[in-house]
């Protein structure tokens, strides 16, 4: 028997998924059913692009509902007491400077379900996070990126 994949996430991340699931079940699902109903009224379904598009959207919505239910059911909540730490762990925000130029970057390391690089939230499965997890303030770390290896020094962990 295979074990189900777990999804590490913050309580906030789980709440966002629950909100999306609720919206899909209560709003989107009904909208799609209504679109299918309207498209059916146009007659011949064999050449009815509105019907095909609505059925495709229905399949997407139902697939996303299943995916969200699975992620929520298998969520492992990352607890963070908000205190500074010396070790980079899941749920923490790590600030590091690139060597030798000193440019600083900060990322919060979260589970893949709530990663959003544009918001500074990177997946624990990303190359940057994998390189930083378990390291301490002051450590110099080599990070493999698509542009090559970069050397960084960890400045803070919150």
UniProtKB/Swiss-Prot annotation:
A GO BP entry: DNA-templated transcription elongation
Keywords: Coiled coil, DNA-binding, Transcription, Transcription regulation
Record carries keyword Cell membrane: no
Any coiled-coil regions, as ranges: 4-75
Pfam families, A to Z: GreA_GreB, GreA_GreB_N
Source domain of life: Bacteria
Any GO MF annotation of the entry: RNA polymerase binding
Keyword Protein biosynthesis (UniProt): no
NCBIfam families for the chain: greA, PRK00226.1-2, PRK00226.1-4
Function: Necessary for efficient RNA polymerase transcription elongation past template-encoded arresting sites. The arresting sites in DNA have the property of trapping a certain fraction of elongating RNA polymerases that pass through, resulting in locked ternary complexes. Cleavage of the nascent transcript by cleavage factors such as GreA or GreB allows the resumption of elongation from the new 3'terminus. GreA releases sequences of 2 to 3 nucleotides.
Family note: Belongs to the GreA/GreB family.
Protein name from the UniProt record: Transcription elongation factor GreA
């Amino acid at each position: 028997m295979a074990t189900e994949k777990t999804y590490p996430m913050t309580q906030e991340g789980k709440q966002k998924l629950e909100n999306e699931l609720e919206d899909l079940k209560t709003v989107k699902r009904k909208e799609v059913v209504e679109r299918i109903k309207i498209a059916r009224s146009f007659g011949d379904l064999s050449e009815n692009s509105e019907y095909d598009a609505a059925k495709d959207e229905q399949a997407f919505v139902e697939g996303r509902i299943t995916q969200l239910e699975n992620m929520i059911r298998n969520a492992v909540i990352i607890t963070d007491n908000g205190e500074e730490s010396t070790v980079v762990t899941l749920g923490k925000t790590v600030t590091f400077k690139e060597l030798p130029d000193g440019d600083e970057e900060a990322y919060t390391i979260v589970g893949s379900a709530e990663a959003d690089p544009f918001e500074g939230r990177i997946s624990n499965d990303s190359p940057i996070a994998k390189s930083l997890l378990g390291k301490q303030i002051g450590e110099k770390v080599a990070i493999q990126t698509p542009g090559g290896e970069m050397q960084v020094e960890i400045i803070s962990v919150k």
